[in-house]
Curated annotation (Swiss-Prot):
Its EC number is 2.1.1.-. It catalyses: L-lysyl-[protein] + 3 S-adenosyl-L-methionine = N(6),N(6),N(6)-trimethyl-L-lysyl-[protein] + 3 S-adenosyl-L-homocysteine + 3 H(+). The lineage of its organism: Bacteria, Bacillati, Bacillota, Bacilli, Bacillales. It is found in: Cytoplasm. Disulfide bonds: none annotated. This is Ribosomal protein L11 methyltransferase. Keywords: Cytoplasm, Methyltransferase, S-adenosyl-L-methionine, Transferase. The keyword S-adenosyl-L-methionine applies. Transmembrane segments: none annotated. It comes from Exiguobacterium sp. (strain ATCC BAA-1283 / AT1b).
C-alpha cells in the first residue's frame, strides 16, 4: 500500500489550525517539526522528549512543518485541492507563513518508520513519562510510565497544555481522590490521575472515536478498574461531586461550563483547566471568579496557560 505524506510549512501560531485541517481531510494524527521546540527540549534538563541531538537535522531551519499521512487513493487530488483552499481561507484569519504544501509518496514500510521516528519517550512531570507502545523503556525508581499509541488521534501528551495539566494534577491530587476528566481525548489525563493515586476517574468525551481511543489506552495501562470512559457533552447530565475536575480544552469551550464545573466540584476541591491561549487568560480567570472559584495558581508554558481554581 502506498501512502501520501502531506507537509505544510507554516508558523507556530497556525500549527493547531493547520493540524485541524489535516485531521479533517482524513489524517489520523500529525507530526510537528519545530526547531524552536526542539532546541527548548534539548536545553531543558527537566521535562520533555528524550531526543538525540542528531535528530535536529531533519527539522526546518525556520517556521514549522506540520506533516500528515493519508492513504494514496484515487480521490487524493481532490483531497489535496480542498486542503489548499482551506489553507488559503485560513490565511485571511491568521499568519500562516508561506503555507506551502508539498507531497511525497512513500511505501507502507517507509510510512511506518517515517511517523514512528518522531515519537520518543516524554518526561511529562516529576513522576510520569509517556512512552510510545513500541519503545523499549526502563523506568527509573518511582517513575510511572504511561503507554500510548501516537498513531491514534487525540493527542500524545507532548503538547504544552497536556504537560501543564498533568503537572498540576500531580501537584494537587491526593490519594483516594475522585476525579472527572472533561473532554478526555486520548485519556492521558485520566490515566495520569489513576497512576497518581485517584480512587476513581470518570472520563468524558463527545466524540465516539475519542471514547474508543481512551478506552483502549486505559486498558493498555492497566487502569480499567479505576477509569470509566463514557460519551458525554461536557458536564451535561453529570451528577455528584468530585475532588478534581480537569479539562484540557480550548478557552471558549471552558467558558461554556464553568458554572457546571463549580457545581460538580466538592468544597475544598479544585478545577484544573488548561488549553487556554495567553490572550484568553483574563477572560477565563474572570469567569472562574464570577462563578465562585478562588484562583489558587496559574502556570504558563510558551503561550499556553493552565489555571488551578479552588472551591471554598
Amino acid at each position: 500500500m502506498k501512502w501520501s505524506e502531506i507537509c505544510v510549512h507554516t508558523t507556530q501560531l497556525a500549527v493547531e489550525a493547520v493540524s485541524n485541517l489535516l485531521h479533517e481531510v482524513g489524517a489520523q494524527g500529525v507530526v510537528i517539526e519545530d526547531v524552536e521546540d526542539f532546541d527548548r527540549m534539548m536545553a531543558e534538563d527537566h521535562f520533555g522528549e528524550i531526543w538525540d541531538v542528531s535528530d535536529r537535522e531533519t527539522y526546518p531551519t525556520s517556521g514549522v512543518h506540520v506533516k500528515a499521512y493519508v492513504p494514496a487513493s484515487g480521490d487524493f487530488q481532490d483531497l489535496l485541492s480542498n486542503l489548499k483552499k482551506e489553507i488559503e481561507r485560513l490565511r485571511t484569519m491568521l499568519d500562516i507563513g508561506s503555507g506551502d504544501v508539498t507531497v511525497a509518496e512513500i511505501d507502507e514500510e517507509d510510512w511506518a518508520h517515517s511517523w514512528k521516528q518522531y515519537y520518543k519517550p516524554v518526561k511529562i512531570s516529576q513522576q510520569l513519562t509517556i512512552v510510545p507502545l513500541w519503545e523499549e523503556y526502563t523506568p527509573q525508581p518511582e517513575e510511572n510510565v504511561i503507554l500510548l499509541d501516537p498513531g491514534m488521534a487525540f493527542g500524545t501528551g507532548t503538547h504544552p497544555t497536556t504537560m501543564l495539566c498533568i503537572q498540576a494534577i500531580e501537584n494537587y491530587i491526593r490519594e483516594g481522590d475522585h476525579v472527572i476528566d472533561v473532554g478526555t481525548g486520548s485519556g492521558v489525563l485520566s490515566i495520569a490521575a489513576a497512576k497518581l493515586g485517584a480512587a476513581s476517574v470518570k472520563a468524558l468525551d463527545l466524540d465516539s472515536v475519542a471514547v474508543e481511543s481512551a478506552r483502549q489506552n486505559v486498558e493498555t495501562n492497566g487502569v480499567g478498574e479505576l477509569v470509566q470512559v463514557d460519551t458525554g457533552d461536557l458536564l451535561k447530565g453529570v451528577e455528584g461531586e468530585y475532588d478534581l475536575v480537569v479539562a484540557n480544552i480550548l478557552a471558549d469551550v471552558i467558558l461554556l461550563f464553568i458554572e457546571d464545573a463549580y457545581a460538580r466540584t466538592k468544597s475544598g476541591g479544585r478545577f484544573i483547566t488548561s488549553g487556554i491561549i495567553g490572550e484568553k487568560r483574563a477572560e477565563v480567570t474572570n469567569a472562574l471568579v464570577a462563578a465562585g472559584f478562588e484562583i489558587e495558581e496559574t502556570r504558563v508554558m510558551e503561550d499556553w496557560v493552565a489555571i488551578i481554581a479552588k472551591k471554598g
